[in-house]
Amino acid sequence: MLDSLKVTPRQVTGSGPAAGQSTLAPAPELPEPAVAGWRPRRQNARRVLALAALLPLTVILAVKAASLGTQVFVNAYGMGVLGATILVMYVSFGNYRDPSEDATTLTARPLVSCLVAVRDELAVIETTIRSLLNQTYGNCEVIVVDDFSTDGTREMLTALAERLPFTFIALDRNVGKKRALVRAVEASAGAYYVFTDSDCIVGADAVERCMLAFQAHPGIGAVSGHARALNSDKNLLTRMQDVWYDGQFGVSKAAESVFRSVTCVSGPLAAFRREAIYNYLPAWAGDRFLGAEFRFATDRQLTGYVLGQYWIGRKLKHQYQNSPFVSAVDYPERKWGVAYVASARAWTNVPDTFGRVLRQQTRWKKSFIRNLFFTGAFYWRRGVLASALFYGHGLWVLLAPLLAFRHLVWLPLHGQFLLTALYLGGVLLKGSIWGLAYRFQNRGDGRWIYRPLMSVLSATVLSWLLIYSLLTLRRSVWSRG
């Protein structure tokens, strides 16, 4: 065990009736198996042409802005952002294929360890556990680690573990999400790991879809599922985030998956081969940045070890050679692929107040900064097009607050309101392109209209959080919002 994990856990292994028979509460109604309602996306010329047809509009917008005397750099940035958006969609809609579709049935069912770290999630954690126990895959073990909850979560889980078949570990001090999950791995026996956040519901067939992808593609070391907002109907903010989630997974991750280089296997549903991450867990749990422990970047950082281990793995294992995660077994460094499985579904509770959105986005931007230094150091080796997506996105995020200041503050102060209007028009255009993509993937769903609103919120408010995140980078608190 890692030195910093030397806590005194209390462990309870459930041996009671199966899920659905708890005497504490009836089993919640779970969404139907994801694949049952999912429409596979093949190469579709009409969709590609519809998206590509927007490219001339992007050029016209840039030319018009240039004719008004703005700087070449600013025009190139705006044109680049819109052009890159269309390129990502072209790659996604024209080339993505769900890797789980390449295997019709499972020829074997090795043990899968489903792992959850929880802190103060009394209202939702039982639902999360039940969704894992209800998996169609069958051969799963569920391990839940409580990271020193103070809201009654620990007591509830202690009682629940006597009635449902899962292993519960209670830590006697708060160690952070990464270290709590490493403790779960130590107690596991599976050849594959499935992580989910403690406020999520995992589709009944999600583990099976991930395992089909692993079986069909031995070179894939990790896969991300598809996440939507569980509480999307609550208010305007949750609906905006739900539509945004759909695009981030169904378009952005799909495009990265074409190159087998998904940069973030996200928390709602993240699956890994044991051999792809086991040796790097001490480096992950003990990650330090700018001289301090860095508790964020849990998903991105772990994905980075899969993507980059061929180039950085040996050095990391040497650094942690005394850890049992390295000394007990030494897996070879491989050029693993990382993919996205669209038919593996999960639902997560998104922030439902503006303050919670800001706190979550701040946490994510801190993770982005850390990941830019870590993954950015080797990602260029993943190929030209994959690298263009990664570094182009990084450049866009870094420049976004500067462009927002210029167009929303500096130019209006100097009376150039037309340029501000053009900037906001470009933001709305970009959001509308994403909204169109949402319509393509969700026929008959009118929520696409919320996507342009999310783009405006991101450009005018959320982009500024990058500066605040930089200033508070060393402040590390595990909080969901």
PLM segments and residue spans:
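Non-transmembrane catalytic domains and loops of membrane-associated enzymes and transporters
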Residues: 2-16, 24, 104-379
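Membrane-helix boundary/interface segments in integral membrane proteins
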Residues: 20-38, 375-377, 404-408
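N-proximal low-complexity "stem/linker" segments adjacent to membrane-targeting elements
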Residues: 24-127
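Loop-to-transmembrane boundary segments
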Residues: 36-47, 380-395
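Membrane-embedded multi-pass helical conduit in multi-pass membrane proteins
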Residues: 59-97, 104-106, 389-476
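A general structural signal for short secondary-structure boundary/capping elements
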Residues: 268-273, 288, 386-394, 407-408
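Short, charged juxtamembrane terminal tails flanking transmembrane helices
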Residues: 477-481
